[in-house]
Amino acid sequence: MRVTVLVGGVGGAHFLLGVQQLLGLGQFGPQQCPDTLTTGHELTAVVNIGDDAWIHGLRVCPDLDTCMYTLGDGIDPQRGWGHRDETWHAKEELARYGVQPDWFELGDRDLATHLVRTQMLNAGYRLSQITTALCDRWQPGARLVPASDDRCETHVVITDPINDSRRAIHFQEWWVRYRAQVPTHSFAYVGAEKASAATEAVAAIADADVILVAPSNPVVSIGAILAIPGIRGALRTTTAPVVGYSPIIDGKPLRGMADKCLTVIGVQSTATAVGQHYGARRTTGILDCWLVHEDDHAEIEGVAVRSIPLLMSSPKTTADMVNIGLQLAGVSA
């Protein structure tokens, strides 16, 4: 079975672990051999690139790297991002030079990933090709595909806390430096009008047996993916059912600041509102099925809805909720 998942960073990576456990892939599958040869299943993640940024002259792709490190068993378990057993000598030396930005941390081991990526970009390789090359080192047990090979970044219009004027900043500055604690007016997917979906991403959607929308941030993760021309169209025309998982439980996000992002775009922080925001595929949206938490209730015209436990407390519990979604869509793992 070919499973394609739309994901963001930390939450999306944990969701992918659950999919892998259900399918017997990656850390949960046979070792020393290609997983698809032994399980008959194939997992592709179409990953958000809206968080990507140039930092100290290097191209940093936070969500791609978080998925790669997590599935490759190299993530820092305390922080949930970056390398395990990281050191910070370069960061400390940059601080002594007074180099900005000083609010974005890059560890020494993590720098190697960004150096390789930047060198390959400068040599003319596409981000999709580079991601495949990086994954050769990590063996994540899934194919990681950027939503686009083009530059398409999420920017945020805020009121500057110093001079009280409106200005646009990169999402990373809003998220990491300000922790979303500044007056925020809108989000913009800069470059989307000139970007196109990666060929590999479109193919993964078109060829899938089922497509899962992870409970990632619906604005700056899934929303940023859907903003790329070609992605939404591929979701609407694929023959595979599209199953979404609510990132909101009892009015609060599973993780991160999805509620703050939803408020900015005028969407309530409820499972129903997010499902309606995505919309039914039989009208103009992307969903066939929508999974909400057992204490929530949702009715979305044209979408099959089921209430189940949605807390991703372990790969096993996540695998269970993935399996229920497949059953709702009429697909068997």
Curated annotation (Swiss-Prot):
Homodimer. It comes from Mycobacterium leprae (strain TN). Belongs to the CofD family. This is Phosphoenolpyruvate transferase. Pfam families: CofD. HAMAP family: CofD. One of its GO terms (molecular function) is LPPG:FO 2-phospho-L-lactate transferase activity. Transmembrane segments: none annotated. Catalyzes the transfer of the phosphoenolpyruvate moiety from enoylpyruvoyl-2-diphospho-5'-guanosine (EPPG) to 7,8-didemethyl-8-hydroxy-5-deazariboflavin (FO) with the formation of dehydro coenzyme F420-0 and GMP. It catalyses: enolpyruvoyl-2-diphospho-5'-guanosine + 7,8-didemethyl-8-hydroxy-5-deazariboflavin = dehydro coenzyme F420-0 + GMP + H(+). InterPro entries: CofD, CofD-like_dom_sf, FbiA/CofD. Its cofactor is Mg(2+). Pathway: Cofactor biosynthesis; coenzyme F420 biosynthesis. It is an enzyme of class 2 (transferase). 7,8-didemethyl-8-hydroxy-5-deazariboflavin binds at D65. It comes from the Bacteria. Its EC number is 2.7.8.28. GO terms for biological process: F420-0 metabolic process. Keywords: Magnesium, Transferase.
